[in-house]
C-alpha cells in the first residue's frame, strides 16, 4: 500500500470502529446512566491503536478486516475500562483524560467503577456472539482465552498491581519492563495476536508478529513516559508531569530522558525487523509503528 492508501485505510478502519462501538452501546438494555457512563469514556476519542493493530494484522494476512471488527471493539472496551479504573482516586487520581473530565468526575466513583465493569464484561459477550463462519468456534474460544489472560492477573492487571506497588520505590530496568510488558504490552500484543488468529497466520508468522507487538508495546510506553515530560497538556489530554507527581517509576527517571529516547529507538527498530521477517503485507502495521515512535499525544 502507498502511504496515502495506508492513511486512508487506517482512517476508514478507525471510523468503522467508532461506528460499531456506538452501535454496541446503543443496543444495550440497562440503566440509562450506566449506558451514558460507558459511552462517555468509550466515545471520548483516542487513537484506537489496539483495534487498528488487530484490523491491520488481518489485512496484512490478506483477509477482510471487517471480520475482526467485533474483537477489535472488544479490545477497545477493555482498554477503556482500564482507563476509567486507572483514573480513580484510589489509583492515579486523575481529573483529565483525553482532554475531558475523567469518568468519576462526571458520574461519581461508584458509577465509574460500574461503567468499567460493564465494558470489561461486555467485551467478552461480543466475542461469544460472533456468528461468522470465517471465525469458527475453536478460534473464538482461543480469542476469549487469550484475551482473559492478556487483560487479567497474568497480564494488564498484573502490570497495574506492580505499578502501584512500585510507587515511591527505585526499580531496576527489569522491574520497570515487567510493569510495562504487562500493563501496556500484553493488550497491544493480544491485538496483533488476535489479528493473526483471525487472519490465519502460520506458526512462523505468528511468532514474528508476536515479537513485533512485544517491542511495539514497550516502545509505546516509553514514548508515553517521554510525553509526560515533554508533551503539551492540550495534546496529550491529561496533566503533564502526573507520573512524577505520583512518584511513578518511568524510563526517563531510570535511564534519563536521553537514555529513554535511545531505548525507544531500539524497540522501534526491533519491531520493524520482526515485522519484515513475518513476510506479510505489513504497510499499515509499519505505519502504526512510525506513529508510535513520533506521536505527540
UniProtKB/Swiss-Prot annotation:
Recite the UniProt cofactor note for this protein: Binds 2 Mg(2+) ions per subunit.
Q: Where in the cell is it found?
A: Cytoplasm
Name the coenzymes or cofactors required.
Answer: Mg(2+)
Binding-site positions, (2E)-geranyl diphosphate: 97, 183-184, 221, 238
How would you classify this enzyme at the top EC level? Answer: transferase
**Example GO molecular function:** metal ion binding
Q: Which residues bind Mg(2+) 1?
A: 86, 92
Q: Which GO terms describe its cellular component?
A: cytoplasm
Domain of life of the source? Bacteria
GO BP of this protein: isoprenoid biosynthetic process
Q: What is its main location?
A: cytoplasm
State the family named in the UniProt similarity comment for this chain. Belongs to the FPP/GGPP synthase family.
Stored PANTHER family = FARNESYL DIPHOSPHATE SYNTHASE
Its recorded name reads: Farnesyl diphosphate synthase
Q: What is the lineage of its organism?
A: Bacteria, Bacillati, Bacillota, Bacilli, Bacillales
Amino acid at each position: 500500500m502507498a502511504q496515502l492508501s495506508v492513511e486512508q485505510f487506517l482512517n476508514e478502519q478507525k471510523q468503522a470502529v467508532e461506528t460499531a462501538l456506538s452501535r454496541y452501546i446503543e443496543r444495550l438494555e440497562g440503566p440509562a446512566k450506566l449506558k451514558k457512563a460507558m459511552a462517555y469514556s468509550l466515545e471520548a476519542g483516542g487513537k484506537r491503536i489496539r483495534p487498528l493493530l488487530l484490523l491491520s494484522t488481518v489485512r496484512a494476512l490478506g483477509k477482510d478486516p471487517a471480520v475482526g471488527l467485533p474483537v477489535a471493539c472488544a479490545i477497545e472496551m477493555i482498554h477503556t475500562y482500564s482507563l476509567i479504573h486507572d483514573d480513580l482516586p484510589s489509583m492515579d487520581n486523575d481529573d483529565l483524560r483525553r482532554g475531558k473530565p475523567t469518568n468519576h468526575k462526571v458520574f461519581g466513583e461508584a458509577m465509574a467503577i460500574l461503567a468499567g465493569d460493564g465494558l470489561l464484561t461486555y467485551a467478552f459477550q461480543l466475542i461469544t456472539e460472533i456468528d461468522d463462519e470465517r471465525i469458527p468456534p475453536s478460534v473464538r474460544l482461543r480469542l476469549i482465552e487469550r484475551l482473559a489472560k492478556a487483560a487479567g492477573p497474568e497480564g494488564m492487571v498484573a502490570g497495574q498491581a506492580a505499578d502501584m506497588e512500585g510507587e515511591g520505590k527505585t526499580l531496576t530496568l527489569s522491574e520497570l519492563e515487567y510493569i510495562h510488558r504487562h500493563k501496556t504490552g500484553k493488550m497491544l500484543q493480544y491485538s496483533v495476536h488476535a489479528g493473526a488468529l483471525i487472519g490465519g497466520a502460520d506458526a512462523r508468522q505468528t511468532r514474528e508478529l508476536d515479537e513485533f507487538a512485544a517491542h511495539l508495546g514497550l516502545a509505546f510506553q516509553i514514548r508515553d513516559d517521554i510525553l509526560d515530560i515533554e508533551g503539551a497538556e492540550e495534546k496529550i489530554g491529561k496533566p503533564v508531569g502526573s507520573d512524577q507527581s505520583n512518584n511513578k517509576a518511568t524510563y526517563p527517571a531510570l535511564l534519563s530522558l536521553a537514555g529513554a529516547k535511545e531505548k525507544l529507538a531500539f524497540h522501534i527498530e526491533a519491531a520493524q525487523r520482526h515485522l519484515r521477517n513475518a513476510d506479510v503485507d505489513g504497510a499499515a502495521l509499519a505505519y502504526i509503528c512510525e506513529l508510535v515512535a513520533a506521536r505527540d499525544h
